[in-house]
Amino acid sequence: MTVVSVEHALAGKLPEGGEVTVRGWVRTLRGSAGLAFINVTDGSCFAPIQVVANDTLPNFDEIKRLTSGCSLIAKGVLVKSQGKGQSFEIQASGVEIVGWVEDPLTYPIQPKPMTPEFLREVAHLRPRTNLFGAVTRIRNCLAQAVHRFFHQNGFNWISTPIITTSDAEGAGQMFRVSTLDMVNLPRDATGNVDFSRDFFGKETFLTVSGQLNVEAYCLALSKVYTFGPTFRAENSHTTRHLAEFWMIEPEIAFADLAEDARLAEQFLKYVFRAVLDERGDDLAFLAERVDKKAISKLEAFINAPFEQIDYTDAVKLLQHAGKTFDFPVEWGLDLQTEHERWLTEEHIGRPVVVTNYPEHIKAFYMRLNDDGKTVAAMDVLAPGIGEIIGGSQREERLDVLDARMAQFGLDKEHYSWYRDFRRYGSVPHAGFGLGFERLVVYVCGLSNIRDAIPYPRAPGSAEF
């Protein structure tokens, strides 16, 4: 018995007339004059394969009762299909039914249009749909391409801790990790919670970024990256925010902001090319049902050189855009999505790297420029979504870093280990961060980031 994937069976690389076995789930079934036409999918590709069963099979009456979602093993002869829209089909010599759908009428995944809102309520079943099957395969393709890009370019992957004592962003929006009894918290002499009696002997949190930790390895191995889960306790009920998501954070030694921007451009174009090359079937479906530009926007992105513009110049352009924005445009304020999209879509028409932001709106670790008013920071903006990458050259001068930490009200003793990098062989270095789900949203043309991750975590929502 040669078990093959549906993708392999449809690819035309197996001998026609050979015996094959496929295992999967029923997508649809229709009957006609002693025949049953079963569309079977195993998730290996977008298209199902048609299994043709005739009434000479001993369990044909049972086969006719199959419904969407039932699981089976079908064996038979692989032949060229006579029908339209598929290359090969299986003339079944046997169909073993492995699992029935208990009540087809109440089965949530029906062969009809279903809204993303409804499917979020049954997130454990939504990968069975065409949409989320496609999104999941594209997400996997992107993840594999991320690791492949960095591996091919000499980077080392670093596993940074999920449990941490440091706030890399300085925003204070962190999830606390504790084994203390919340009903009977231990108190110290001042009445505050005594975290010395907690599991780690101090306050600990879920990480908001692996950047500070990965810098340590950058300053020993030169080119590193981390790719893992991060957590933000932002009470944001928007289509752009998750409480749990994955971050890609490379870091390069002996590098400035210009090199950081080049790395970001090379990286994005590489992973987009991988999706176009490997997941054309899923992109074609998304272009038909979700975002008609799903393919063309990636091709345009890859072929366009990035435009670089200073933040100060971007503000001037926006102020003279002849357009009324919902959010004010003023030097010293961060750019909003509407501003970013105007720059990329209406003014420049391709990806944009905005550099040198005001120092007070960016993180403490970003390198202070000579003007004393801006930092060597960048945001990569993409048409259709706005910011997709944020990065900077890191502050390698200890005295300047200490001053920046004081400005942000951070205890430098708490960050003594991070300061050590500037005390022992400090070098210029840079890096960036990219929310993986934002990448998935952009590629798939999704309208809500909660559809870009298998089990979304958001304020008031932690199902499954």
From Swiss-Prot:
Q: What is its main location?
A: cytoplasm
What PANTHER family does this protein map onto?
A: ASPARAGINE--TRNA LIGASE, MITOCHONDRIAL-RELATED, ASPARTYL/LYSYL-TRNA SYNTHETASE
Q: Which NCBIfam families match?
A: asnS, PRK03932.1
Q: Which gene specifies this protein's sequence? A: asnS
Q: Report if keyword Protein biosynthesis is assigned.
A: yes
Protein name per its UniProtKB record: Asparagine--tRNA ligase
Q: Which SUPFAM superfamilies match?
A: Class II aaRS and biotin synthetases, Nucleic acid-binding proteins
Biological process (GO) annotations held by this record are: asparaginyl-tRNA aminoacylation
Molecular functions (GO terms): asparagine-tRNA ligase activity; ATP binding; nucleic acid binding
Instruction: Give the reactions, separated by semicolons, that this protein catalyses.
Output: tRNA(Asn) + L-asparagine + ATP = L-asparaginyl-tRNA(Asn) + AMP + diphosphate + H(+)
Q: Which Pfam families match?
A: tRNA-synt_2, tRNA_anti-codon
- Give the transmembrane ranges: none
The record's GO CC annotations read: cytoplasm
- InterPro entries (UniProt xref): Aa-tRNA-synt_II, aa-tRNA-synth_II, aa-tRNA-synth_II/BPL/LPL, Asn-tRNA-ligase, Asp/Asn-tRNA-synth_IIb, NA-bd_OB-fold, NA-bd_OB_tRNA
Concerning its family, UniProt says:
Belongs to the class-II aminoacyl-tRNA synthetase family.
Per the record's keyword annotation, is Acetylation included, yes or no?
no
Top enzyme category: ligase
State the oligomer form and interacting partners.
Homodimer.
Q: Which UniProt keywords apply?
A: Aminoacyl-tRNA synthetase, ATP-binding, Cytoplasm, Ligase, Nucleotide-binding, Protein biosynthesis
Compartments where located? Cytoplasm
Instruction: Give the enzyme's EC designation.
Output: 6.1.1.22
